[in-house]
């Protein structure tokens, strides 16, 4: 039988007492009073911060949004089906943040920056707060470099600059996403990092966009943040801020970024749902009182940084959906007042076959020609004026029976200019091709052609210049100006191609 030695036991106890480390750990906890509809009411959690992350017993994470006298309103970042009344909740002491790194390029992630493309985990050594303060006044400089979208109508008349916020607004099915995705495709080789945020979209639509990017090699420089229609409202509300945090990471590293929020109407609806369930007082259109702040703090994060901070930029293209063309609704007017201009897409133009369906009359860029190269400024001024006069004349001509020759000529020119602005989807043009196209139209070279020949001729002209007059593109890309030499080369090419084209058509 084994003997118990008291001295050995007392020695072990003494050693344990000496090695005892006194540590007091205070955990801020509470209990669930009520849970449902993505909202939980918690009793306790006395020292929780607004916006702090809280963790439920079964692992679900939530954000404390409502701090009331006797309970805390928490929005859940998951379905919360396993949370029970009376289960415990602890405050984490952290505000929502996500990991950030170069490894995110080419990946599809959710609002918590977790990959959802089935290609394994993403390693990141750094993290950023989802809600970061926007750069201050002294940290910015005015927008002066163009961000080419590849769409003639935008680059010529509603130019977008690096660091600008330009709203894309229009009814459903008017090509808003197409304008945004074409802009991403056009950034190939421009050293611009793109972030596409899909909020409350159909999963099939997001898959289509991702496939399009992959086929055209755009995923190499793009990050897709997706929260589909079946995601909890909390995650749909957070997705744009996650996208902005990723874009900021690159902006502060002296890179240029482009971020697309598709679309902010859905984010506002998700926020409205959360606010109403938290019993916050409803305002206009049942949106909460701080819905303006929801979007302003997001869009103010887009900036062109000063030279001291490395001149990085973040250009934002938010998308807002209107109902029956009503731009005076609550969310559209809010976002219009925050952004530096808007591109208005019209259902009538879309149905009339004018695509991209941009209504040039009420679209505007508040940065203007500061975001254009000199060559574009030179040819585009005339285009906008002629199109405005044409729109006025066209409305008047509907009621007039006999028009004089000058008016007929002006109408014919306007129709041809409108034709040259049409572009197929996913076929962006370089700035040199745009300058060439606009010059051909505004200087009357298309007037002798039939309307249905215009686009065919322009496609052939662009190919002809590329192969036979490469010096034209070299001059514009190197000097950024439309020199006399470039003009002479272009005139020569237009005439040579016109002769060939007319002979082909006759044959």
Swiss-Prot record:
<dbReference type="InterPro" id="IPR004100">
    <property type="entry name" value="ATPase_F1/V1/A1_a/bsu_N"/>
</dbReference>
<protein>
    <recommendedName>
        <fullName>ATP synthase subunit alpha, chloroplastic</fullName>
        <ecNumber>7.1.2.2</ecNumber>
    </recommendedName>
</protein>
<dbReference type="GO" id="GO:0045259">
    <property type="term" value="C:proton-transporting ATP synthase complex"/>
</dbReference>
<keyword id="KW-0375">Hydrogen ion transport</keyword>
<keyword id="KW-0150">Chloroplast</keyword>
<keyword id="KW-0067">ATP-binding</keyword>
<keyword id="KW-0547">Nucleotide-binding</keyword>
<comment type="similarity">
    <text>Belongs to the ATPase alpha/beta chains family.</text>
</comment>
<dbReference type="GO" id="GO:0009535">
    <property type="term" value="C:chloroplast thylakoid membrane"/>
</dbReference>
<feature type="site" description="Required for activity">
    <location>
        <position position="363"/>
    </location>
</feature>
<dbReference type="InterPro" id="IPR000194">
    <property type="entry name" value="ATPase_F1/V1/A1_a/bsu_nucl-bd"/>
</dbReference>
<dbReference type="GO" id="GO:0015986">
    <property type="term" value="P:proton motive force-driven ATP synthesis"/>
</dbReference>
<dbReference type="InterPro" id="IPR000793">
    <property type="entry name" value="ATP_synth_asu_C"/>
</dbReference>
<keyword id="KW-0066">ATP synthesis</keyword>
<keyword id="KW-0813">Transport</keyword>
<dbReference type="GO" id="GO:0046933">
    <property type="term" value="F:proton-transporting ATP synthase activity, rotational mechanism"/>
</dbReference>
<dbReference type="InterPro" id="IPR023366">
    <property type="entry name" value="ATP_synth_asu-like_sf"/>
</dbReference>
<dbReference type="InterPro" id="IPR033732">
    <property type="entry name" value="ATP_synth_F1_a_nt-bd_dom"/>
</dbReference>
<dbReference type="InterPro" id="IPR027417">
    <property type="entry name" value="P-loop_NTPase"/>
</dbReference>
<comment type="subunit">
    <text>F-type ATPases have 2 components, CF(1) - the catalytic core - and CF(0) - the membrane proton channel. CF(1) has five subunits: alpha(3), beta(3), gamma(1), delta(1), epsilon(1). CF(0) has four main subunits: a, b, b' and c.</text>
</comment>
<dbReference type="Pfam" id="PF00306">
    <property type="entry name" value="ATP-synt_ab_C"/>
</dbReference>
<feature type="binding site">
    <location>
        <begin position="170"/>
        <end position="177"/>
    </location>
    <ligand>
        <name>ATP</name>
    </ligand>
</feature>
<keyword id="KW-0472">Membrane</keyword>
<keyword id="KW-0139">CF(1)</keyword>
<comment type="function">
    <text>Produces ATP from ADP in the presence of a proton gradient across the membrane. The alpha chain is a regulatory subunit.</text>
</comment>
<keyword id="KW-0406">Ion transport</keyword>
<dbReference type="InterPro" id="IPR036121">
    <property type="entry name" value="ATPase_F1/V1/A1_a/bsu_N_sf"/>
</dbReference>
<dbReference type="GO" id="GO:0005524">
    <property type="term" value="F:ATP binding"/>
</dbReference>
<keyword id="KW-1278">Translocase</keyword>
<dbReference type="Pfam" id="PF02874">
    <property type="entry name" value="ATP-synt_ab_N"/>
</dbReference>
<dbReference type="InterPro" id="IPR005294">
    <property type="entry name" value="ATP_synth_F1_asu"/>
</dbReference>
<keyword id="KW-0793">Thylakoid</keyword>
<dbReference type="Pfam" id="PF00006">
    <property type="entry name" value="ATP-synt_ab"/>
</dbReference>
<dbReference type="InterPro" id="IPR038376">
    <property type="entry name" value="ATP_synth_asu_C_sf"/>
</dbReference>
<dbReference type="InterPro" id="IPR020003">
    <property type="entry name" value="ATPase_a/bsu_AS"/>
</dbReference>
<dbReference type="GO" id="GO:0043531">
    <property type="term" value="F:ADP binding"/>
</dbReference>
<keyword id="KW-0934">Plastid</keyword>
């Amino acid at each position: 039988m084994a003997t118990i030695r008291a001295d050995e036991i007392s020695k072990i106890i003494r050693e344990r007492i000496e090695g005892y480390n006194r540590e007091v750990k205070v955990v801020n906890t509470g209990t669930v009073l009520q849970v449902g509809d993505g909202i939980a009411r918690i009793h306790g959690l006395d020292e929780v911060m607004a916006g702090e992350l809280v963790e439920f017993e079964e692992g679900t994470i939530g954000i404390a949004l409502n701090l009331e006298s006797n309970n805390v309103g928490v929005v859940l970042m998951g379905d919360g089906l396993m949370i029970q009344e009376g289960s415990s909740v602890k405050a984490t002491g952290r505000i929502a943040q996500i990991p950030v790194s170069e490894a995110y390029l080419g990946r599809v992630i959710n609002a918590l920056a977790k990959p959802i493309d089935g290609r394994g985990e993403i390693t990141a050594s750094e993290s950023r707060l989802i809600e970061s303060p926007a750069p201050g006044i002294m940290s910015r400089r005015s927008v002066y470099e163009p961000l080419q979208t590849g769409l003639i109508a935008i680059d010529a008349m509603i130019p977008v600059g690096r660091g600008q916020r330009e709203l894309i607004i229009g009814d459903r099915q008017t090509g808003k996403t197409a304008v945004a995705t074409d802009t991403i495709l056009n950034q190939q080789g421009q050293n611009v990092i793109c972030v596409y945020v899909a909020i409350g979209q159909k999963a099939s639509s997001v898959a289509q966009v991702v496939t399009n990017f992959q086929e055209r090699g755009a995923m190499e420089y793009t990050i897709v943040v997706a929260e589909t229609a079946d995601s909890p409202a909390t995650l749909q509300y957070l997705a744009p801020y996650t996208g902005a945090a990723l874009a900021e990471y690159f902006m502060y590293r002296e890179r240029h970024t482009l971020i697309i929020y598709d679309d902010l109407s859905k984010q506002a609806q998700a926020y409205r749902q959360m606010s109403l369930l938290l019993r916050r007082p409803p305002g206009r259109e049942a949106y909460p009182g701080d819905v303006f702040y929801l979007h302003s703090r997001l869009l103010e994060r887009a900036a062109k940084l000063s030279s001291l901070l490395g001149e990085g930029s973040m250009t934002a293209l938010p998308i807002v959906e209107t109902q029956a063309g009503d731009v005076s609704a609550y969310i559209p007017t809010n976002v219009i007042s925050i952004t530096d201009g808007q591109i208005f897409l019209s259902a009538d133009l879309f149905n009339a076959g004018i695509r991209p369906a941009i209504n040039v009359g009420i679209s505007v860029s508040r940065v203007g020609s500061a975001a254009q190269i000199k060559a574009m400024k030179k040819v585009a001024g005339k285009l906008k004026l002629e199109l405005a006069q044409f729109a006025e004349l066209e409305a008047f001509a509907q009621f007039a029976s006999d028009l004089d020759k000058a008016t007929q000529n002006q109408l014919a020119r306007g129709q041809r200019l409108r034709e040259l602005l049409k572009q197929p989807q996913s076929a962006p043009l370089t700035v040199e091709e745009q300058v060439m196209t606009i010059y051909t139209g505004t200087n009357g070279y298309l007037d002798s052609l039939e309307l249905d020949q215009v686009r065919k001729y322009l496609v052939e002209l662009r190919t002809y210049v590329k192969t036979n007059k490469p010096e034209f593109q070299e001059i514009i890309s190197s000097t950024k100006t439309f020199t006399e030499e470039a003009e002479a080369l272009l005139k020569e090419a237009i005439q040579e191609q016109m002769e060939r084209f007319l002979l082909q058509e006759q044959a």
